[in-house]
Amino acid sequence: MILVDRDTRVVVQGITGREGSFHAQRCREYGTRVVGGVTPGKGGTTHEGFPVWNSVAEAARAEGANCALIFVPPPTAADAVMEATDAGIPLIVCITDGIPALDMARAKAYLATRQSRLIGPNCPGLISPGEAKVGIMPGHIHKAGTV
C-alpha cells in the first residue's frame, strides 16, 4: 500500500521549532508538497517560506492538507494527533518520542473511532522513493523500484 506520493499535501505541526523547521525543509527539498505548518499563536506569519496557521483545521481548509507530520514536544503530541484527526486529516505521521504512555493510549482510543491512520509515534516516518518523504530519514538512501 502506497501512503504518500507526489499529490500528498503535508502540514507540519510544530514547524517553527528546530526539528520541525529542519525536517520540513528536507521534505520540501526531496519534492514533498509541504503546504505549511501549524504553531498556535503564530498563525498568519511565515516561517522559512512556509505559511503558518494556528490550527490544523485552518491549514486543511486553506491548503487541502491530507497528511500531518508532527514535531511537537512529548506532553502535547497526543493532543496534536487528535487535533489532526478532528481536522479530517487521513494520514498522521508522529515523529515525537517520549510521549507519556497514558496520553498515547487515550489518543489511540480516540483514533479507533475516527477515519485517520497514525504512523508512529517515535518513528522515522515514511517514504515513497522519488515521490515524497514524510519524516526524518535521509532521502538519498532510498531508491525507487520493486522490492
State where each predicted segment sits:
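N-terminal Rossmann NAD(P)H-binding glycine-rich loop of SDR-like oxidoreductase domains
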Residues: 16
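General beta-strand structural signal in soluble alpha/beta enzymes
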Residues: 12, 36-39, 92-94, 117-122, ...
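Generic hydrophobic/aromatic pocket-lining and core-packing "Φ" positions
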Residues: 24, 56, 81-82
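Rossmann-fold NAD(P) dinucleotide-binding segment
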Residues: 62-64, 71, 75-98
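Rossmann-fold NAD(P)-binding glycine/threonine-rich loop
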Residues: 97-119
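Glycine-rich oxoanion-binding loops at beta->alpha junctions
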Residues: 43-77
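NAD(P)-binding Rossmann-fold cofactor-contacting core
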Residues: 25-47, 121
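Conserved anion/nucleotide-ligand pocket segment
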Residues: 126-147
